[in-house]
Amino acid sequence: TEMSACEGVGALPFERDSWQEEVLLHDGSKMVITRSQTYGGRHEVGQPSPIKEHTISFTLPNTDKTIRWTSEYSEDLGRTNFQLLAVHALNGTPYLVTEPNLCLSYNKWGRPNPPYVFFKYDGAAWQRIPRGAFPHEFTTINVALSTIGRKGADLVKQGVVSSEKIQ
């Protein structure tokens, strides 16, 4: 069996990073989220692999229900669809703020203006919601934004990243 040097690029399994972050909610309370990401997909020769899939999971305060969200790999993008910006909760309902991951994702998700995609968990699944349905109480970015390379490795080493280090 022959294989060219380029045939396997982006097809090999890559490592997974995982860490926890303490998220400061709008009311001053905190919750811990677990984040993990895998690497792979299309990229230029000599460049690191992009984030292929990004997952968060958390238990809402005062509940025992674990909630999970994944920004999955998209073949048309060659990477994950979204970059996470914030995790919020109001009256037991979680919300997410994400941004499309580069121009192809921005186009795929309808060129939102401002360039954010909002999600609300309806008790069974995550649903995209319009900006106007996103609670006005949420005004902050409350998760680590730089999660690749050395900065990602630093997050993993810290165990639980405190909310003070994220702000």
State where each predicted segment sits.
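N-terminal export/targeting and maturation segments
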Residues: C6-T66
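Sec-dependent bacterial lipoprotein signal peptides
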Residues: T1-S4
